[in-house]
């Protein structure tokens, strides 16, 4: 038979361990990761060759990444139904025009299944005039797209130098990285 005190202490220990495992042991208010907003940027330095592709554009022309050779390119993977993508696109439009004369280009890659019927009115509504292409399964896999929006910065030599996952909501986050590679 169990003694009542032993059962009581066992129960208290179990409850305490459960609370600690759920809430953690430390004060998370000083932990930067605990303060990161849900749509915060995830950026990574990359040094690998960007896979070339040939994708259909909104003008119904085949466009390849190699046609941007010698430029710094920001590939923006997005969809019309993605709210954070809608926040980023006007920022990318500004960046495209701000740095175009310095050899920079934004290339949007839509993952929408409806393609032209949905994408064309969407980009007209946002006044987007940088090139928009339609993703295929291969480019989606080669660039390891796991979230939208995802932006991939490619340097003049065709190397992937930076990757942004999620919406930064801030032009400055992109400016710092773009200017580094111009």
Protein language model regions, located:
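Structural microenvironment flanking redox-active thiols in thiol-disulfide oxidoreductases
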Residues: 87-126, 135-142
């Amino acid at each position: 038979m169990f003694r009542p005190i032993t059962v009581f202490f066992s129960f208290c220990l179990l409850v305490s361990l459960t609370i600690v495992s759920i809430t953690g042991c430390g004060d998370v208010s000083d932990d930067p990761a605990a303060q990161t907003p849900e749509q915060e940027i995830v950026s990574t330095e990359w040094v690998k060759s960007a896979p070339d592709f040939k994708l259909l554009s909104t003008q119904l022309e085949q466009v390849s990444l190699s046609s941007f050779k010698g430029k710094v390119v920001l590939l923006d993977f997005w969809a019309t139904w993605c709210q954070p993508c809608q926040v980023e696109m006007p920022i990318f439009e500004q960046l495209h025009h701000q740095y175009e004369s310095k050899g920079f280009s934004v290339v949007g890659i839509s993952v929408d299944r409806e393609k032209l019927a949905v994408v064309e009115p969407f980009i007209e509504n946002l006044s987007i005039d940088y090139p928009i292409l339609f993703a295929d399964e291969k480019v989606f896999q080669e660039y390891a797209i796991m979230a939208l929006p995802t932006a991939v910065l490619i340097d003049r030599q065709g190397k992937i130098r930076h990757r942004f996952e999620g919406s930064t909501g801030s032009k400055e986050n992109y400016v710092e990285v773009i200017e580094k590679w111009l």
